[in-house]
Amino acid sequence: MCAKSLLLVFGILLGLSHLSLSQNWATFQQKHIINTPIINCNTIMDNNIYIVGGQCKRVNTFIISSATTVKAICTGVINMNVLSTTRFQLNTCTRTSITPRPCPYSSRTETNYICVKCENQYPVHFAGIGRCP
């Protein structure tokens, strides 16, 4: 294979890897970042992105913030869990019983530090509240 062909293949792969990362960041935003402090857990958790293996997700934490502020946690971080240096307003929805959809949830609000998994300077996984595992 000639050098130009290898360069082309490498460029395509690099472009696809960036697309994959942006999808993970986009999914993180959909699942965890919300701008309004008033959340109805029973309504929001009935969305299909919170259904795992046909079952309602047991727990999900929402970060009440802008995506820009949350993304800043990962500035300069390539691949590791990072604890925020500032506290965030959080709303955690917890399933209260195993029933068919729509599942019932309780809501808990708090202000605390968050731990996120960073990949190539983007948050891709909510890892914890108050400390990193």
Curated annotation (Swiss-Prot):
GO terms for cellular component: extracellular region. The keyword Hydrolase applies. Its EC number is 3.1.27.-. It comes from the Eukaryota. Disulfide bonds join 41-93, 56-103, 74-118, 115-132. It is an enzyme of class 3 (hydrolase). GO terms for molecular function: carbohydrate binding; endonuclease activity; nucleic acid binding; RNA nuclease activity. Residues 1-22 form the signal peptide. Keywords: Disulfide bond, Endonuclease, Hydrolase, Lectin, Nuclease, Pyrrolidone carboxylic acid, Secreted, Signal. Substrate binds at residues 57-61. The active site is at residues 32, 125. Coiled coil: none annotated. It is found in: Secreted. The modification Pyrrolidone carboxylic acid is found at residue 23. Belongs to the pancreatic ribonuclease family. Monomer. Preferentially cleaves single-stranded RNA at pyrimidine residues with a 3'flanking guanine. Hydrolyzes poly(U) and poly(C) as substrates, and prefers the former. The S-lectins in frog eggs may be involved in the fertilization and development of the frog embryo. This lectin agglutinates various animal cells, including normal lymphocytes, erythrocytes, and fibroblasts of animal and human origin. It is cytotoxic against several tumor cells. This is Oocytes ribonuclease. It comes from Aquarana catesbeiana. The lineage of its organism: Eukaryota, Metazoa, Chordata, Craniata, Vertebrata.
